[in-house]
Amino acid sequence: KFNKKSVIGLNIGANKQSLDMKGDFSKVLTFCGDNINFATINISSPNTKHLRDFHNKGQLKELISEVITNNNELQAPIPIFIKISPDLKLTQLEEIVDITDQYQLAGIVATNTSTDYGLLKDTKAFSKGGISGSPLLHKSTKILAQVSIISDGKIPLIGVGGVSSGADAFMKICAGASAIQLYSALAFVGPSLIASILKELNTILDINGFNNISEAVGSKKVEYASS
């Protein structure tokens, strides 16, 4: 049952068997849009063939244009985010930031999982799927920082990828994130992890002389973008 007091977001992707990926994004938004507070257009899962093709400028513009049209037809249009891959070149990030600004999206979620198996100690153990958790932390944070620089801090960013502690969350914030998402660590540790992260994060903010999270957002983006 939908609780109006809760903030509910929907991560919209495409199925492997989809015959119309672009159309499916809009169909799901139309069907669910009136019961959620925000939606994320996930074009970055490495497990769905051709899904990452939507990072290409032309295809992305077509997708976002259709999604925005359907969003505007809802009873109350909702904020739309876009979730990107960590395996992108700088020119691709620049195009994504331009499109995000052009269509006035709510923000960018950086990042999804990676297909860079060099991040693993044992590269022979995996040959498909996406890398998540701690091996992804630094790669995803670098992309986050680069997006923050390209957008000049004017586009809200959600940092995700390898966060399992207050120190990890602080890294994402300093790279440019104004919000954090968890998945892998939450699955391993459980809901108690959130309180632990918040407690550690408060201590780290105090030690570094920040009065609040907003003051720390993007404070080390140049450093992390080149690391």
Regions found by a protein language model. Name each.
Residues 46-55, 93, 99-153:
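Glycine/Thr-rich beta-alpha phosphate-binding loop at enzyme active sites
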Residues 26, 88-102, 148-153, 163-180:
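Catalytic cores of alpha/beta
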Residues 43-45, 107-115, 169-196:
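Glycine-rich phosphate-binding active-site loops on the catalytic face of alpha/beta enzymes
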Residues 117-133, 186-210:
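C-terminal helical cap(s) of enzyme catalytic domains, especially alpha/beta-barrels
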Residues 137, 199-227:
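Extended, intrinsically disordered, low-complexity segments
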Residues 71, 151, 201, 205:
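Conserved hydrophobic residues forming the short capping helix/wall of the S-adenosyl-L-methionine
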Residues 8-12, 39-42, 80-84, 108-110, ...:
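Hydrophobic faces of well-ordered beta-strands that scaffold small-molecule active sites
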Residues 1-104, 117-120:
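Active-site entrance/lid segments in N-terminal catalytic domains of soluble metabolic enzymes
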